[in-house]
């Protein structure tokens, strides 16, 4: 009986959270960002919380924005349309480092941190850069 009640509560909570996420008005700055960098995709879901705003596009690209609508993270790992993060979003120093040290690698995730950057390549490597674009960590 407890399992049935738990399952029912879980389904109701999921349904409410999905309904709330879909009914949120998207800020024009976020819409403009999507139209500029992901013109072949549309916003599927917007999920704000106390720290940031998560956005999922209809091609499964995931975006994360700070509360001031500044983009924070772009994740194209599961995108059905975009094979990599748009090059316009990637700092030139990071692109140069990846091209020089990982020829043919594609940047699937890009995150702006407060003190640097973090990327994930299509080969599974994660690289962290400080604010001067020096690699501080490589993780596989």
Task: Report each predicted region and the residues it spans.
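Bacterial Sec-dependent N-terminal signal peptides
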Residues: 1-24, 34
């Amino acid at each position: 009986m407890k399992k049935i009640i738990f399952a029912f509560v879980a389904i109701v909570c999921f349904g409410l959270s999905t309904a709330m996420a879909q009914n949120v008005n998207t800020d024009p700055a976020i819409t403009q960002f999507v139209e500029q960098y992901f013109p072949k995709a549309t916003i599927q879901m917007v999920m704000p919380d106390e720290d940031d705003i998560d956005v999922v596009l209809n091609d499964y690209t995931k975006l994360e924005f700070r509360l001031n609508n500044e983009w924070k993270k772009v994740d194209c790992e599961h995108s059905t349309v975009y094979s990599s993060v748009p090059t316009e979003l990637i700092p030139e120093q990071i692109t140069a480092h990846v091209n020089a040290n990982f020829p043919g690698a594609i940047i699937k995730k890009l995150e702006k941190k407060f003190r640097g950057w973090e990327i994930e390549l299509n080969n599974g490597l994660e690289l962290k850069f400080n604010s001067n674009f020096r690699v501080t960590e490589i993780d596989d």
